[in-house]
Amino acid sequence: MEATATKEHLNFQTEVKQLLKLMIHSLYSNKEIFLRELISNASDAADKLRFEALTDGALYESDSDLKIRVSYDKEARTITVADNGIGMSRQEVIDHIGTIAKSGTREFFDALTGDQAKDAHLIGQFGVGFYSAFIVADKVTLTTRRAGLTHEHGVRWESGGEGDYTLETIDKPGRGTEVTLHLREGEDELLNGWRLRSIIRKYSDHITLPIVMKKEEWSQEKNENTVTEEDETINQASALWARPKNEISEEQYNEFYKHVAHDFEPPLAYVHARVEGKQEYTQLLYVPSRAPFDLYDRESRHGIKLYVRRVFIMDDAKQLLPNYLRFVRGIIDSNDLPLNVSREILQESKDIEAMRAGSVKKVLGLLDDLAQSETDEGKAKFKTFWKEFGQVMKEGVAEDYANRERIAKLLRFVSTHSDSEEQDVSLSDYVGRMKDGQEKIYYVTADSLTAAKSSPHLEIFRKKDIEVILLFDRVDEWLVANLPEFEGKHLQSVAKGSLDLGKLEDEAEKKEQEKEAGEYKELTEKIKEVLGEQVKDVRITLRLTESPACLVTETHDMSGNLERLLKSAGQKVTHTKPILEINPYHPMVERLKSEETHFADWSHILFDQALLAEGGQLEDPASFVKRINQLFLSTGSKE
């Protein structure tokens, strides 16, 4: 097949134009990272070649000595990063460089704030390494040829970063990619061998491929360093995770994280372990400092790279960690898996099951250590972790039955114990503060913290000084449905079933409720008749001390909050009729006993108020307003 010698003038995708502007403005203060990003891309290209060559050795084209070469030209004012990895075809260049063809693009741009520091972090997360070249260059030339294609299928891509680029077919004898940066004015300090070497050692020492430069020697005659023809390897060129832990510095761990996670910030915490036994594997797993912008997209990229005997196999190895730990980044290197392992094999592999269980154990252990830390640093780290990843950790209660108790101990909530709005109360904290005779862990669910705090269902609990956990994250309904108890204590919604305080409720209160139920039997039946199909029942309650009424559901029925959540997500839900509970001591209820003319209006308002108080929406707001107006007028006319 002959290559068509064409030269095209093309425009960047709109998002790429936006990204190029962001790059220059948000990342200039950390401009050195351009070299890290280009080297990282070159390393990935070599990994992909190794993997494809497992089934097609001809891709090496008699050149299996993979390396990355960095060079510079003072006169031309250029820096070049070249690799002999997999390379790209013409279409791949268009797909990978002219466009951003990935999910989450819209979410990424929506998340941008205009704050340089925050935007720099987001840009890093998005994985836009190649474009970082434009931080220091006003023109970038890329030449490439994909392994397996003949020499006349080379491609040259060139752009000034203004919104367009040229693309032409060229003859390229060697496979791989070469990126040449034509530096902007004022960036000449980068045209220095010592400077480039220091950047490579700082950011890319962990890269497993040799990163080579031409050796430089001092010339007495020229009174400067001169470049020789001898190659010199700048980095250690060994798998960082395979080194003994005591030989790896904190800075090296951090830089390796930035490489695998495409992040610009150091990680929050990490665990590095070698497992020996039936399965032998090494894991280096990181918890990021901030949540990615697509964290709540359960189909988003997972962060674990799989290696087999230090040979890269795949990115995004979802089988290695459960979905609720999708924020974890890092690598797992197996000694036992076959080199030709596929995603299909991973789904059925017993070795993978064992590695997954071991990795979950390590991550949860790391989080346990942070949660139990007595140091200010440890406490601050766990606080940050929960703020960033707490909601997805709650998913684990339903997803990971084997570790449910362990995950439950990591959960943090707001409660009525204090006025704090931070989720810093653990279930163990709650159990430790339970009153003598208290047998249940009480909670209320709502669509916001404000709604939870003002829920009428809390009134009797506040009166008796019984702590209630306030749940307002969307995932919380799913959480409590899958966590029936903790340390032998049943979790009980304060808005479900009849009020049951167990030993905390004295006999006098029980008798009083029975008495009131008898006295108000006629009233509750009359209200129920008026409300008809809107309610399942109407009954007297002692759970209210200030409000006239509230809505509850039967113990095993869907809560009103969950019903609203599912409907808002577009799911078809069978409506659960609530039970209207009324406070016999409230003036509004007492008035109803003697009301005749406007009994139906007062009954409907009682129900509508209770619905609004729990965050519900009125089916007929106009009728509600009309009734309120009529009652205002009737009350005024009596005076």
Curated annotation (Swiss-Prot):
It comes from Nitrosospira multiformis (strain ATCC 25196 / NCIMB 11849 / C 71). CDD domains: HATPase_Hsp90-like. Residues 565-639 are annotated as: C. Residues 1-343 are annotated as: A. Molecular chaperone. Has ATPase activity. The lineage of its organism: Bacteria, Pseudomonadati, Pseudomonadota, Betaproteobacteria, Nitrosomonadales. Gene3D superfamilies: 3.30.230.80, 3.40.50.11260, Heat shock protein 90, C-terminal domain, Histidine kinase-like ATPase, C-terminal domain. It holds the Pfam family HATPase_c_3. Residues 344-564 are annotated as: B. It is found in: Cytoplasm. Keywords: ATP-binding, Chaperone, Cytoplasm, Nucleotide-binding, Stress response. The keyword Chaperone applies. This is Chaperone protein HtpG. HAMAP family: HSP90 (MF_00505). Homodimer. GO terms for molecular function: ATP binding; ATP hydrolysis activity; ATP-dependent protein folding chaperone; unfolded protein binding. GO terms for cellular component: cytoplasm. Belongs to the heat shock protein 90 family.
